[in-house]
Amino acid sequence: MKKLLLFLFAYITLVGCESKTDSSCGQAFIGGEIVNPVNDFLVLYDDTSPIDTLYLDQENRFSYHIETLSPGLHSFIHGGEYHVIILEPNDSIMLRLNTLDFDESLVFTGRGSKKNNYLINLYNTLDAEDKIVYEVSKYEPVKFLTVIDSLQTEKIEDLNRFKVKYESSALFNKVALASINYSYSTHKELYPFRYFGRHEIKNRTGLPSNFYDYRADIDYNDDVLKDFYPYYNFLFPHFNNLALDRYFELTKDSVFDRNSIVYNMNKLDLMNEMVKNDDIKNNLLKYATRNFLSYNNSDADCDAMYESYQSKSTNAEHSEYITSLYNTIKKLRPGNKFPDIEVTNYKNEVTNIDAMFNKPTVIYFWSHAIKEIGRASCRERV
C-alpha cells in the first residue's frame, strides 16, 4: 500500500505540472529507497544550502515534494556519501541505491531519470578511467595528449548520441559537457606534475604548442557550476599550474617545493585576480589556505598565509573556519597543550580530549567520507 501511495503521489505531482511550462511550473518530486542505510535520513541540498532532511520510513523509503524548485544542480548526502543530481520543473524522480556500493548501485527511474542515469554512468566511467590515465601520464607529451583527446572525443560522441535519442535541456547539455571537458582538462593540468616531477617541472619542455588550448574556453565565474565537483577538481590543479611560473621567477629555486610560502601565496593572488564570482573565489581561497596551514610547520609562513587569506576572502563563515583552524594548528605545535576539544568515547560519554591522556599517546582520526575527501585533497595538492 505504501508503494502504491508513493507512486500515486509522484504521478499526481507530475500530472499537476503538465499543464504548465517548464519555466513556470517550479515543482518537482524526489523519492526512493536506500538499501543498507547508514542512518534513517538523507539531506537534500540546493547548491550548498540544505533544503530539508528526508527521513526513511520502516521500509527505508522516502519521498519529498518540492513546491518551489530552483532548477539546477542539487545534491543529497547519506552517511557521509555525496551525490549530485539535476532537478528541473516537472521532474518526478525515484532513486535506489545500496550503501555497500554507493555510486555503482545508484539508479534513477521516472521523469528526469535518463539525464541523471547518464550523469552517474559518466561519473563511474570517468572514475574507473582515472587509473588508466595515471599510467598514461607516464607517456611522453605528444602520445599522452593523443590518448587523452581520443578518450574525450569518445565521451562527447556518446553524449551527442544521447541527445539525439532523448530530449535534453540546455542545463543538462551544459552540465554533461562540462563533466567531460573539465575532467580531461584536469588530467592535462596534472600531467606536468606527474610526468616531469618536482625536479624537472621548472623546465616543462616538450609540451606541444596546443597542449593548453582548452584554457581559452575556461569560465572562471560559472555560476551554474559553482558547486559542481568536476569544476573544482579542475580549478585547483589549474591554479597550481598557473602559480608555477611566478614561483620560479621569484625564488630562483631549481627544485619545486609545493609547501613554499611564495608558491602558495601566488596561488591566492591568482585566484583573487582571475575569479570574480565571490562564491567560487571564496571556496578556492578557503581550500587552498586550509591545505597549506594543514601541511606547513612554519609559524611565520602560516601567519603570512593566514593574513593573505583574510585580506581576500569575503565569506564570514569561511573566515571563521580558517581562523579556528589557524589557531588550532598553532596550539598543536610541539610543547603546547592539546586544544580544548570535546569528544565522545565508545561508551557514548562526552569528555575533554585533554583529560583522556596521562602518558605519551598516539592519536589518529578517520572520516566516514574519507574516500571523497581523500580524492579531493589529493587533487588539490598535486
What do these predicted ranges mean?
Residues E380-V382:
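Positively charged, low-complexity/disordered segments
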Residues E18-F172, L190, Y195, H199:
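A non-transmembrane, solvent-exposed segment enriched in polar/low-complexity residues
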Residues E349-S377:
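Short active-site neighborhood of thiol/selenol oxidoreductases, capturing the structured segment around
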